[in-house]
Amino acid sequence: MVKVKFLGHAAFYIEGSKKILIDPFLTGNPQAVAKPEDFKDVDLILVTHAHGDHIGDAGEIAKISGAKIVAMYDIANYIAEKFKGVETVGMNYGPTEVDGVFIVQVPAWHSSSDGKYSIGNASGFIVKLDGKTIYHAGDTYVFKDMELFSELYGPIDVALLPIGGHFTMGVKEAAKAVELLKPRTVVPMHYNTWPPISADPEEFKKLVGDKAKVVVLKPGEELEL
Ligand code: NI
Ligand code: MN
């Protein structure tokens, strides 16, 4: 069984035969329900892009857990320089395998920077763990190539999609993404953390209709796959 726990904003904890964090922004995250110290035994940390609300505590958690950080090559180098001794796996768009976990880094239409200077490119991740397929979109606008993700790696058991607008897709665009991705279940994320990304997950649910099962997780809640 694979559990997908929502940690607030875009942070998720995936637990199966491996323990995986994605975008662990905990410190300073108004929605956070966990602290970096809660993840001393995590195996992998996936970072979708360099913005602070995604890199978050990745470096610190890697230090206390010995977890490997998987990210775009340039972002991995940036983290390795900031957090000496942390093990990183720098990759680019494409498939790879890290510690027996199949990971595809896929494009995302978004920027990636330290807030000022560009670092690498933004991405999403498709993770196959214990026979389950999880897609974390990162921060992105909707794009037609999302069709390829289900075509090449599907069926997608759960898609984690931003719905907050302003920096990413809003509810309308995310509902279109569901049409392209054809996931079994979709979990909205990256909304209501701050006023500019206010969104109503019930409106998203209505727009998705019967195209997928929408599970609205509160920070701290989890989904079993
Ligand atoms: Ni971002
Ligand atoms: Mn973001």
UniProtKB/Swiss-Prot annotation:
One of its GO terms (molecular function) is hydrolase activity. Keywords: Hydrolase. Pfam families: Lactamase_B_3. The keyword Hydrolase applies. Gene3D superfamilies: Ribonuclease Z/Hydroxyacylglutathione hydrolase-like. HAMAP family: UPF0173. Belongs to the UPF0173 family. This is UPF0173 metal-dependent hydrolase PYRAB05000. It comes from Pyrococcus abyssi (strain GE5 / Orsay).
